[in-house]
């Protein structure tokens, strides 16, 4: 399937809009004042996010949830939980992509020849907050078997609820 660059750019902009909205909503849920900044980023969002509102929103969002010293690259139990949860979600999204007859390698924005899951990487973006919410509320001090098993529950529950609403 081939589609024009404008169409891909429009879809990517919508994905980023939903991602920032979901981040904002999670911050509001936890009564974080930084949610107002994400409102501003939503207003400033342009086609294809050429001004990198997604990046700015992510910095504000993660700092609001996990503190200003938090970085996604640090080897911490929180990051391990986030990475594990995101991987579970990505595999679920990829399973849905394949089961509907689409190819996972061809992405909307993600376009890396070494990433066999470019489309899944695009589509999972607005869903990451489900994992973020779980990790924020549990704040793991270690990341082992029990923490991995616990992360499977909210992911499975969300997947099941999506199918229930379709019926």
Mark where each language-model region is.
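Internal, conserved structured core segments that host functional sites
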Residues: 6-75
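Short, solvent-exposed helix-loop connector elements
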Residues: 71-80, 104-110
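Conserved mixed alpha/beta catalytic, RNA-binding, or beta-rich assembly cores of soluble enzyme
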Residues: 81-87, 91-95, 99-103
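Small-residue-rich helix-loop
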Residues: 110-117
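Extended, well-ordered alpha-helical scaffold/bundle regions in very large, multi-domain proteins
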Residues: 120-126, 134-135
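Single conserved hydrophobic/aromatic residue that forms the stacking wall/gate
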Residues: 159-167
